[in-house]
């Protein structure tokens, strides 16, 4: 299913010096977001910073949201992950897309202008209404929680 989302370019380099977000393959779920920087930024171990993407979006459809997720290679190879672990973009948000990055590694990491720093995935939204009850209908699982089914 293809859905049109309004995107506003906040930095003139997006679409020229830095590519617009695109899906890398026909099976890709995420669009890569890039650091829209004027110069390289060094992220020291333990430090966090907010990086601009040069974009603003307005999803507009209350049945959709976007999540900002880390890129697997940055976290696994360099220890650079999202500062808030996952970013949530609500359908009515219209401001700039910023990415919080955290260097949880032992070494400093340099982020170059235009570097891919995160990925954005659009997800369906179901707004729930709570129904207050005194008890639940019994299920096989019941109240079994963390690790209740064993390791093997």
Swiss-Prot record:
Q: Where does substrate bind?
A: 71-73, 84, 88-90, 98
Tell whether Calcium is among the UniProt keywords.
no
Q: What role is this protein assigned? A: This enzyme is involved in nucleotide metabolism: it produces dUMP, the immediate precursor of thymidine nucleotides and it decreases the intracellular concentration of dUTP so that uracil cannot be incorporated into DNA.
Q: Which InterPro entries match?
A: dUTPase, dUTPase-like, dUTPase-like_sf, dUTPase_trimeric
Full protein name: Deoxyuridine 5'-triphosphate nucleotidohydrolase
Identify a single GO molecular function assigned to this protein.
dUTP diphosphatase activity
Q: Which reaction(s) are listed as its catalytic activity?
A: dUTP + H2O = dUMP + diphosphate + H(+)
What are the recorded Gene Ontology BP terms?
A: dUMP biosynthetic process; dUTP catabolic process
Q: Which Pfam families match?
A: dUTPase
Under Enzyme Commission nomenclature, its number is: 3.6.1.23
Which UniProt keywords are listed?
A: Hydrolase, Magnesium, Metal-binding, Nucleotide metabolism
Q: Which Gene3D superfamilies match?
A: 2.70.40.10
Disulfide bond positions: none
Q: In which pathway does it act?
A: Pyrimidine metabolism; dUMP biosynthesis; dUMP from dCTP (dUTP route): step 2/2
Cofactor(s) needed for function: Mg(2+)
| Similarity annotation | Belongs to the dUTPase family.
């Amino acid at each position: 299913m293809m859905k049109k989302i309004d995107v506003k370019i906040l930095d003139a380099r997006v679409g020229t010096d830095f590519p617009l977000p695109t899906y890398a393959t026909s099976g890709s779920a995420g669009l890569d977001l890039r650091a829209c920087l004027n110069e390289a930024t060094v992220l020291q171990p333990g430090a966090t910073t907010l990086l601009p993407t040069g974009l603003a979006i307005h999803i507009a459809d209350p049945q959709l949201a976007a999540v900002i997720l880390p890129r697997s290679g940055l976290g696994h190879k360099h220890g650079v992950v999202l500062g808030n672990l996952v970013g949530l973009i609500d359908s009515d948000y219209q401001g700039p897309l910023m990415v919080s990055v955290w260097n949880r590694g032992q070494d400093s990491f340099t982020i170059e202008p235009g570097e891919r720093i995160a990925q954005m995935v659009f997800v369906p939204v179901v707004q729930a209404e709570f129904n207050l009850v005194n008890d639940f209908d019994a299920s096989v699982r019941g109240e079994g929680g963390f690790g209740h089914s064993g390791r093997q």
